[in-house]
Amino acid sequence: MSDEKYPGPLVVEGKLVDAERLKKQSNYLRGGIAEDLHDGLTGGFNGDNFLLIRFHGMYQQDDRDIRAERAEQKLDARHAMMLRCRLPGGIMTPRQWLAIDKFATDNTIYGSIRLTNRQTFQFHGILKGNVKPAHQMLHEVGLDALATANDVNRNVLCSSNPIESELHQEAYEWAKKLSEHLLPRTRAYAEIWLDQEKVATTDEEPILGETYLPRKFKTTVVVPPHNDVDLHANDMNFVAIAENGRLVGFNLLVGGGLSIDHGNKATYARTASEFGYLPLSKILDVAEAVVTTQRDWGNRTDRKNAKTKYTLERVGPEVFKAEVERRAGMTFEPIRPYEFTTRGDRFGWVKGIDHKWHLTLFIENGRLLDYPDRPLKTGLAEIAKIHQGDFRLTANQNLIVAGVPESEKENIERLALSHGLMENVSHQRENSMACVAFPTCPLAMAEAERFLPQFVTRVEAIMNAHGVGDEHIVLRVTGCPNGCGRALLAEIGLVGKAPGRYNLHLGGNRIGTRIPRMYQENINEEQILATLDELIGRWSQERNADEGFGDFTLRAGVVKPVLDPARDFWQ
């Protein structure tokens, strides 16, 4: 089964990275977190606990806007936690929404709720004393934050398509089952945060193992023709195949991922490989087989090279696929036909086949806060008080008020309009996205969320000047090469390099099935806009009918396509 292109070993020998020691010594993710909670001398978690809390859905951060000032005053950084909820498929009840709204107001520094492009929400600025109450509040309304970060299967995404209600419901149920099946089995989360008793049994992790996965692992369930979840950014993807509106099985695609390391040619973005079709009866077996193969074969000697995409490139997709078949006791059928036509959200009211109405609201950057002229956060809380359906968070950082009966439509719309939740914005703004970056993300090299709104305004001006103001280009900004903003699946992707400076990538497409190539490196906003002015001008004049900007940049030879990223991503 070997292939000359993939000569690598199944297991990489060598000195394990320190994260492997940390996991092994953590007593199944307990570490000293419980003791650290009572240490009032510092606002943060110390030593191994700083990393272990990630398995419990939290990152330790500080406010980078005031970091230098505090250092000058000989003060510690102002530590606070970011907490990310586990919310497979992004669906919440109004009761859950009201609970998180109140917590954000009462118990976080910033008072905001951040919707993310992984279909969940984050709290930023939770002080150490409020961490345990945060987990307990989630538990009281049937939520948790287990395994939303670090070396586990993260929050499972599912296409947000409320119109095809029956098919979406079936896909969503599978997203939930996958999430539950691949969760850590340790009782550490319940013991530490929910005060559940320590049971005198030995912990076991039959799927994840004692040292969990080599690196983060991301899963999607996607319902064509909508690629709103950006499947090619993920390790394991189940593409729904329907017959007569009912789900019959899935195509499996494995090994996508966007994270890179500036200047490290051994890292690259990669689209997922098609493995084949499988019936519903085999989904959990196959998912477990993919995860355990990556668990056993993934590189534990180099975290920069540990994700599933690198394992596939080292051993070869066919070898990896054969191992999955062996472990799952099945053989993939040939891929069944599927097509993507869109990945953006459909804004405004749409009526589902169940005769319920669904209102998709554009939430710029996913940040819900009460702005002076637009009390967005209060508006959603007011809607939650009367809404009879559910809320659906999308992978584009927006929110759907779903399942509204005809009799309630007018009341919901009145609240949305009066709180600034239904303002008219351009198609360009609707199709632009950024990660959080400054001031809270410790990895950010450049601004993203705070940079995007005014940058889009300037891009809109360029598009209007060239007569294409009613069109859109998928535009994304990510503050560092880890790529949370998914810029490396955009038509125009900006990757933060240093404060005020970005690498400009061009040549992705509208549906998210192509990696863009770096066009210019380490340039500032004015240089980016000058380049875009020239290229958007050319696109407006030279494009074919219905040709997207990314497709045009390839056809016109502005950039060469990335065809085999392990070998040509950096060319």
UniProtKB/Swiss-Prot annotation:
GO terms assigned for molecular function: 4 iron, 4 sulfur cluster binding; heme binding; metal ion binding; NADP binding; sulfite reductase (ferredoxin) activity; sulfite reductase (NADPH) activity
Pathway: Sulfur metabolism; hydrogen sulfide biosynthesis; hydrogen sulfide from sulfite (NADPH route): step 1/1
Pfam families: NIR_SIR, NIR_SIR_ferr
Enzyme class label: oxidoreductase
Residues annotated as binding [4Fe-4S] cluster: 435, 441, 480, 484
Tagged with keyword 4Fe-4S: yes
Alphabetical GO biological process terms: cysteine biosynthetic process; hydrogen sulfide biosynthetic process; sulfate assimilation
EC nos: 1.8.1.2
Residues annotated for siroheme binding in this entry: 484
Keyword Endoplasmic reticulum included in the entry's annotation: no
UniProt keyword list: 4Fe-4S, Amino-acid biosynthesis, Cysteine biosynthesis, Heme, Iron, Iron-sulfur, Metal-binding, NADP, Oxidoreductase
Reactions this protein catalyses: hydrogen sulfide + 3 NADP(+) + 3 H2O = sulfite + 3 NADPH + 4 H(+)
Cofactor note (record): Binds 1 siroheme per subunit.
Family membership: Belongs to the nitrite and sulfite reductase 4Fe-4S domain family.
PANTHER family for the chain: SULFITE REDUCTASE [NADPH] SUBUNIT BETA (PTHR11493:SF47), SULFITE REDUCTASE [NADPH] SUBUNIT BETA-RELATED (PTHR11493)
Assembly mode: Alpha(8)-beta(8). The alpha component is a flavoprotein, the beta component is a hemoprotein.
UniProt name for this protein: Sulfite reductase [NADPH] hemoprotein beta-component
Organism of derivation: Erwinia tasmaniensis (strain DSM 17950 / CFBP 7177 / CIP 109463 / NCPPB 4357 / Et1/99)
Organism ancestry: Bacteria, Pseudomonadati, Pseudomonadota, Gammaproteobacteria, Enterobacterales
